[in-house]
A protein has these predicted regions:
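ATP-dependent carboxylate-amine ligase catalytic core
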Residues: 16-18, 22-31, 35-40, 64-152, ...
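Conserved catalytic-core segment of NTP-binding enzymes
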Residues: 142-146, 153-212, 314, 324-328
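A glycine-rich beta-strand to alpha-helix segment
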Residues: 374-402
Length: 411
């Protein structure tokens, strides 16, 4: 198959939905010969917010230390290949097509059929093996206990801040969600966690004690280094990343940490496009993937530090599984006007439903049929434009702003 044919087949497997469980991915990884080789270090990352940024920091710092690193994250923003990186480079189209062709032939013989995420994980691990990666960083897709990435034995486990998200799958209390994510902890393997609410901390400590996994909680942000990603929360993510690499026996020093954090590139996380780079804009355009109330709180803090006293023309969209009323409650005070649009996703919330979820004291709002029209209206206000509510929206917006072919996804 060509690359486009291969990804078309892959995206067609999204019809199989999400299947939590480890038997399927274990079978697929075993039959595709994708399990990491002996001696390869694996870092496994779960949590609600900050997973991608923390993974990207670990990858960048490890590469600055001279390690050949494989990075598996989700979702992608613009191009599927973003999910699978070696040494900071996306998997090439030709190798992606070859791997997916082999996987299609294998999957046709398997019952039940592997899911989109399981296939992506198998493709990533096979590519990491071919590239002789010394370190592999795996971000969970959802939860932890039954996430496909948990089929891969890890040497270090990382827990980023935990909040309420994916409640239809993981439970509707912090304790239930924490238990799902704590299940990635392995007997005797070191683990490190971001600061957590007390009820979450208790769950993590109990889980660590049960499997005798040495667990450390980060107690202060990483200071004394320049960090490419804006916001005080990113210094906490940096501290978590450095601690995890230390547990993985990566030889760290000041220069490698500084180089990794300074040269880090992780789009869509308070990413600022200067006005001069956006046709028709007279103020910056900011993209942020905040898609739950906790992330919205973090975004509000970052906005107030970056744009003190300024309000945004906010372009907002969300998918149905998210607490968009809670997000809007926290972000509406940042906006002088709000422009709703449906994201390119079957689970997109209609603009009218988004508008109906606004708090009573919300600023003026308008609804549009697509992102391009909503963005065009927001730009005319002359205010900084904040595009937020979903990583799927951020991906669509980034493709629009960079004039890049967009591969929409539902997972």
């Amino acid at each position: 198959m060509t690359y486009r044919e291969a990804t078309a087949w892959l995206f067609s497997t999204q019809m199989f939905g999400i299947k939590l469980g480890l038997d399927g991915p274990r079978r697929l990884l075993r039959e595709f010969l994708a399990y990491p080789k002996h001696g390869v270090t694996v870092i496994h990352v779960a949590g609600t917010n900050g997973k991608g940024s923390t993974c990207a920091m670990m990858d960048s710092i490890a590469r600055a230390c001279g390690k050949r690193c494989g990075l598996f994250t989700s979702p992608h923003l613009i191009d599927y290949r973003e999910r699978i990186k070696v040494s900071g480079q996306d998997i090439p189209e030709a190798d992606c097509a070859t791997g997916l062709t082999e996987l299609r032939d294998l999957c046709e013989r398997l019952d039940p059929h592997p899911t989109f995420f399981e296939i992506s994980l198998a493709l990533a691990l096979r590519w990491f093996g071919k590239c002789n990666c010394e370190l592999i960083i795996l971000e969970t897709g959802m939860g932890g206990r039954l996430d496909a990435t948990t089929a891969v034995p890890a040497d270090v486990c990382v827990i980023t801040p935990i909040g309420l998200d994916h409640t239809e799958w993981l439970g509707d209390t912090l304790q239930q969600i924490a238990a799902e994510k704590a299940a990635i902890l392995l007997p005797g393997k070191p683990a490190v966690s971001a600061p957590q609410p007390e009820e979450v901390r208790q769950v993590l400590e109990q889980a660590a004690n049960q499997v005798r996994a040495p667990l450390e909680f980060i107690t202060e942000p990483l200071l004394g280094y320049a960090v490419a990603l804006p916001g005080p929360h990113q210094r906490w993510n940096a501290a978590l990343a450095v601690s995890a690499l230390h547990r993985a026996a990566i030889p760290l020093n000041f220069d490698s940490i500084q180089y990794g954090l300074t040269n880090l590139r992780w789009p869509g996380r308070f990413e600022v496009f200067p006005a001069a780079s956006v046709p028709g804009a007279s103020a910056p355009v900011i993209l942020d993937g905040a898609h739950n109330p906790h992330a919205a709180d973090v975004l509000a803090t970052t906005w107030q530090a970056a744009f003190p006293g300024q309000q945004a023309a906010m372009v907002f969209s969300a998918v149905a599984s998210k607490d968009f009323p809670g997000i809007l409650k926290r972000l509406a005070p940042l906006a002088s006007s709000i422009f709703f649009c449906p994201v390119s996703n079957p689970r997109a919330v209609p603009s009218a439903d988004l508008a109906a979820a606004l708090p009573p004291d919300a600023p003026p709002h308008q609804s549009f049929d697509d992102f391009a029209t909503a963005f065009g209206a927001a730009v005319t206000t002359g205010s900084p434009v904040l595009i937020v509510g979903s990583l799927f929206l951020v991906g669509e917006a980034r493709a629009y702003l960079t004039n890049t072919r967009f591969q929409p996804s539902v997972q």
